[in-house]
Amino acid sequence: TGLVEKKGIIYIWTNKNLKSRNLEIKVRKELGIEQKLLNQKEVLDLEPNLKPVFDAGVIYESAMHARDPHGILKKIFKLFLERGGKFIQANIKNLEQINKNETAIRSENDEYKFEKTVVASGAFSKSLTDQLGENIPLDTERGYHVHFKDCDHLLSRPVIFSNRGFGIPPMEQGLRVVGTVEFGGLDNPPS
């Protein structure tokens, strides 16, 4: 199976939430996003393993989804190395923009200087970019999900239950049920 699939994405809802869905559909149409409204039967024809607890849906046929985000990162990393990138595993303490073309990166033991630097430290990126004078409005987003192994065959594409606030994308690791995130900062315990 590929790392990324273009099978579309389906949003489903109940009739009691139709008003907000109509606005969403209208805005996306105005933005030129291709979409196809589906009744319950049409959704079930595409995804027969869904329980019919919804009334209608919309499919975005040109949408793509990642079946293996970790695999994607590994391929990008491999390509980075093949194109001459360096990987240095170190605990970074400080970044400093020395001049327009040079950044110093200091670890506990060494200092490295580079023409181009990418800060990709997840939740810890802001504390590093702040040292460069970049005021990036970045906070930590914690996402919560559950995987059901060996169930990815039950859906052929992601399905989002709009008014219930969760989605189910099929992934290499199984079906992932996602929906809850919090902007809790680095110091707060998980909720």
Task: Give, region by region, the residue ranges found by the protein language model.
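Surface-exposed helix-capping loop/turn segments at secondary-structure junctions
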Residues: 1-5, 31-36, 82-86, 114, ...
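Dinucleotide-binding Rossmann-like beta1-alpha1 core, especially the glycine-rich loop
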Residues: 1-40
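Active-site substrate-recognition segment that forms the wall
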Residues: 3-4, 94-97, 101-102, 111-112, ...
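Helix N-cap/beta->alpha junction signal
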Residues: 14, 69, 121-122
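Helical element adjacent to the flavin cofactor pocket in flavoenzyme catalytic cores
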Residues: 19-29, 53-116
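Residue-level signal for well-ordered alpha-helical positions
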Residues: 24, 49-50, 131-132
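C-terminal catalytic lobe of FAD-dependent flavoproteins
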Residues: 35, 42, 69, 162-163, ...
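Short beta-strand/turn micro-motifs at beta-sheet edges
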Residues: 45-49, 164-167
